[in-house]
């Protein structure tokens, strides 16, 4: 009920979890954007990428339609990952690292846009964070030439990014 009015002036729509790509209202929102373009809106989505590759292919199709129709300004993907391998699977209940990496590959090759990995440090991830950094370097070698630089410059824009936000204490204290 609120979407038609809010979407007129909204610049960034950030869709977060649970897992947004498992929720039917996410897809309804995408359908609405295709039918009623909002070229000023940038969509940011947080996902754990723990679903079937078929679902990621569906997302790629939707993002492609929204871009081709100028339905949105931009689409940005954010995923949480703190380390790599067995330790990552242990830290994130239900994570299948092979499925996660396949979904990332489908997204990067299909959408040809960057992805940002959000890192949350804890006692188990900080000791193996280097393995994740090594993996990021590997991905950068794989995807840097696949994903175009949309800035219109020769500037090297990282396609595989990671964010390590730092918060000493809650702001209210």
What is each PLM-predicted segment?
Residues 9, 29-30:
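Catalytic cores of extracellular degradative/oxidative enzymes
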Residues 123-139:
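Catalytic cores of alpha/beta
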Residues 98, 105-106, 110:
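Mature, function-bearing regions of proteins
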Residues 1, 7-24, 36-101, 114-124, ...:
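Core AdoMet radical
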Residues 32-37, 110:
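Short, acidic, metal-binding catalytic loop of nucleotide-sugar glycosyltransferases
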Residues 2-3, 108:
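An active-site-proximal structural segment forming one wall of the substrate-binding cleft
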